[in-house]
A protein has these predicted regions:
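Catalytic cores of nucleic-acid endonucleases
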Residues: 23, 27-28, 38, 50-60, ...
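Acidic-basic catalytic patches of nuclease active cores, encompassing PD-(D/E)XK
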Residues: 2-59
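Non-Sec secretion/translocation targeting segments of pathogen effectors
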Residues: 1-5, 67, 184-187
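Short acidic loop-to-beta-strand element that houses the catalytic metal-binding Asp/Glu
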Residues: 64-70
Length: 187
């Protein structure tokens, strides 16, 4: 059967299909991010962690983390801060330039970068002197985590990595000076 469409009509049809595909790919990405966040939050809460409120999450700018969660000991004292990269479906971990090299989400380098640049985290640390002091003096461990939710079922959450994030004195001093400038800072 011969195609009776003109080349112009065929080009328009292909352009329309391409636009629709681009829209659907964007929607797939957005839904994957939502599935990743919901899966990671659900898993973190099942593990007994408390998610820091008012964190912007994915796609809120290049300097914001997906999730920050705090694990507490049996006496309700903060034990660790988790800097979480949450991935849904088959989304890959992203990289970004950090100090002249590329750092991958879920790595200690990436976590340290986020901690210096994420204003929402700065606000949370400014309001919580116990958490802030513990991070700065090293008594509260910082951990870079990756949580993957490959399917939209909470039972499918995978936690492939949890890596300690070392913070030296110079880094702690820099973070302290950034957080201290926040209007909600309390001693």
């Amino acid at each position: 059967m011969a195609n009776n469409r003109s080349p112009i009509t065929e080009q328009r049809r292909i352009a329309h299909i391409a636009d629709a595909l681009a829209h659907e790919q964007g929607e797939y990405t957005r839904l994957g991010e939502e599935v990743g966040i919901v899966g990671a939050e659900s898993s973190l809460e099942r593990e007994g962690m408390v998610i820091l409120p008012d964190i912007d999450g994915p796609n809120e700018g290049n300097h914001s983390g997906d999730i920050y969660a705090v694990a507490y000991d049996e006496d309700s004292r903060p034990r660790s801060l988790h800097v979480v990269a949450a991935k849904g479906y088959s989304h890959r971990l992203r990289t970004r330039p950090v100090d002249g090299a590329y750092a991958t989400q879920g790595s200690p380098e990436y976590a340290r970068h986020l901690m210096l640049t994420d204003r929402c985290l700065h606000a949370a640390l400014a309001k919580d002197p116990v958490l802030r002091r513990g991070i700065l003096d090293g008594s509260i461990e910082v951990i870079a985590d990756v949580y993957r939710t490959p399917r939209p079922y909470m039972s499918s959450v995978i936690h492939p990595s949890a890596i300690p994030v070392p913070l030296d004195r110079a880094y702690a001093s820099t973070l302290q000076s950034i957080v201290r400038q926040h209007p909600d800072y309390t001693e």
